[in-house]
UniProtKB/Swiss-Prot annotation:
NCBIfam families noted in UniProt: rpsB_bact (TIGR01011)
Domain of life: Bacteria
Ribonucleoprotein found in the keyword field: yes
Annotated Pfam families: Ribosomal_S2
Keywords associated with the record: Ribonucleoprotein, Ribosomal protein
HAMAP family attached to this UniProt entry: Ribosomal_uS2_B
Descriptive protein name: Small ribosomal subunit protein uS2
Species whose genome carries this gene: Borreliella afzelii (strain PKo) (Borrelia afzelii)
Species classification: Bacteria, Pseudomonadati, Spirochaetota, Spirochaetia, Spirochaetales
Name of encoding gene: rpsB
InterPro entries named among the record's database cross-references: Ribosomal_uS2, Ribosomal_uS2_bac/mit/plastid, Ribosomal_uS2_CS, Ribosomal_uS2_flav_dom_sf
GO biological process, one term: translation
Keyword Ribosomal protein included in the entry's annotation: yes
GO CC list: cytosolic small ribosomal subunit
Family designation: Belongs to the universal ribosomal protein uS2 family.
A Gene Ontology molecular function term of the record: structural constituent of ribosome
Amino acid sequence: MAIITMKSLLEAGVHFGHQVKRLDPRMKRFIFSERNEIHILDLQKTLQGIKDSYELVQRVIKDGKKVLFIGTKKQASEIIEQEARRSDMPYVNNRWLGGMLSNFNTIRKSVQKLKKLEKMEVDGTFDMISKKEISQLNREKLKLAKNLSGIKDMETLPGAVFIIDPKREQIAINEARKLKIPIISVVDTNCNPDVIDCPIPGNDDAIRSVALFTKIISDAILESDKEVGIQIIENLNEEDLMKEIEIKNDKSDSIEEGGNNL
């Protein structure tokens, strides 16, 4: 059973939003306070978002469908691939190609081309063609693999998508909404939560925060067949929470980790 504590969220810098001037007004309901011109997110609502997302993911997996992990920004890319691979799920971590969902059949043709080239490389076909042809085919393979390797085994549309940074992945969100595919996403204070089915209020820039959220989704997938849920431990009262926020109010840790949360 996954155990999530409010203190673990604080330690990952989950509560840090952007500068107050960058607030999307639709995020106001998720704001706890303001410190040094930085919005502080309400971790009670973050915990609820985690719980709702965990349960949705487990329902999707039990229905025999997959969750597509999406995160192409620098500080999310490696984490997205790592956690998607750990839970044997498809992922997009380099660039979202328009139509990956809405024009899925065409994208599948490109995936089949990639698989064919990979097969040619190992079945001896390359031994029977010229070096020039091999070079051309390798360039084509690398180009396809760069954007499609994470979805090679996604034979059908996913049952849900998990997204880091919905502002950056707006095209993916539009396609998922068009196809009525449930969207789970970490939403920072500059995001629009109203287009997300399961919004998780949180810092989508700091590496530790991104890693924590992505691991939680991966854990939900891996534990879906064990009939176990998630345990939320709210181990800080409001007074303690304010003290912790004051202690951790220096945003330098988040920035040093690859965040650009200002």
